[in-house]
C-alpha cells in the first residue's frame, strides 16, 4: 500500500490589483497582513479586520487581512509596472482558491495481495 500526496496547488495570476499598505505589511502577492490595508478595487479581494472571519486567533494590535480573489495578485501603486512585468501570468501560492487550499492524497493498493 502506498500513499501519494503533493504540496497544495497554485493559481495562474493574470490580473494585478492595487493594495495600499504600510511598510510592515507582509510581502506575499496573494495575501496581505498589516495595519490599515486598503484596496483600490474592493471586488478583487476579501478584506477584513476581524480575525474571526478567517478563524484566526486575536491579534494584539489592529491588523487587517486581505486575500486576493480569482486570478488577482497584489501590487503597490509605486511599483505597478514592475510587478505587472514580473508576475503577470505566473503561478502563485497563498490565496483562498480550492487549488491553493486542497492537498491531494491518493491511496494506491495492489489488485491482489
Descriptions of predicted regions:
Residues 1-113:
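Feature captures the catalytic ectodomains and active-site-proximal regions of enzymes
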